[in-house]
Amino acid sequence: NFKIKFLSNNQSFENKDLSNDKYHLINIWASWCLPCKKEHPILIKLSKEDNLNLIGINYKDKKKSANNFLKDLGNPYNIILSDTDGTNSIAFGVFGVPETILINSKQTVIKKFIGPLDANDYKNILNAIYEN
């Protein structure tokens, strides 16, 4: 279970708010993270998949820096959350950025990707969401 504030306001998002009809890709990222910039085009491609909900968790970052990052590189996320002190990410078992977690519609973790996503990860994510 998790409860994290949105980047845009002080309202909270909880795992019970996840829709049950899609897969969810939770991406933990930061504007200061160079590998996050490297993987960003793959997230943009994944954002075009109808069966996938992209959730970005901005990690140990400033709101303005995070917004500028998304303004410059594009926003692939359906939902953007903010973990300014990193405690929520640590609760997920995340100790660095980027990390990405694929969750099915029953909120079960399918796969965890440590480090930047690459073309092979992109294929694996598509295979996972369309095979089930």
Give the residues covered by each predicted segment:
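A short beta-strand-turn-helix
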Residues: 2-24
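Short pre-active-site segment immediately N-terminal to redox-active cysteine/selenocysteine motifs
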Residues: 22-24, 28-32, 96
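Conserved redox-active cysteine motifs that mediate thiol-disulfide chemistry
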Residues: 28-45
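Extracytoplasmic/secreted envelope proteins and their assembly/folding machinery
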Residues: 40, 44, 63-70, 122-126
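Conserved segment of the thioredoxin-like fold in thiol-based oxidoreductases
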Residues: 48-85, 97
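Thiol/disulfide oxidoreductase modules built on the thioredoxin-like
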Residues: 71-76, 83-130
